[in-house]
A protein has these predicted regions:
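Core catalytic lobe of class I
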Residues: 1-153
Length: 153
């Protein structure tokens, strides 16, 4: 059984497996991707995790999945999009795709391509999200976003 207010330091599939009901309102995570770090042989099963999160997320709940792509030999892996398709295939709606602009990206000076100074923030929802809180405080880059509008879906 899951105790609310407790932090579990374990494989998320084990944690999800301890509940028989949909109990999650929101998940926010930046999982490991593209073998950029060694996790002692741990393989990250995106499809299993997406399916487990879909099963345990409440109707109207959301998953914010922050992920980027590895650049290898001048080519991006596009694994972030593979993750998005895995969540869609598990049953989630792709509610929003946002860009997280990193303030302090990993330096790269290859001189042949733009530096990847961002990650994708995919917002997956199980049905229509229960809550939407648009930005109401002005941001530094506000002029750049003037052409974007919030629309009802």
């Amino acid at each position: 059984m899951i105790e609310f207010g407790k932090i579990y330091n374990e494989n998320c599939l084990e944690t999800l497996g301890r509940s028989s009901e949909s109990f999650i309102d929101m998940t926010i995570t930046s999982p490991p991707y593209d073998d950029l770090r060694d996790y002692n042989g741990y393989h990250f099963p995106v499809e299993e995790i997406a399916a487990g999160l879909f099963e345990k997320t409440k109707e109207g709940g959301v998953v914010i999945w922050v992920v980027g792509d590895r650049t290898y030999n001048g080519s991006e892996s596009l694994s972030s999009f593979s993750h998005a398709f895995a969540f869609r295939d598990a049953g989630f709606r792709v509610h929003d795709t946002m860009i997280y602009a990193k303030n302090n990206p990993i330096p790269s000076d290859c001189g042949k391509r733009y530096r990847q100074a961002f990650e994708y923030m995919f917002c997956f929802s199980k049905g229509q999200p229960k809550t939407f809180n648009p930005l109401t405080i002005p941001i530094k880059q506000e002029k750049a976003f003037k052409s974007f509008r919030i629309t009802k879906v």
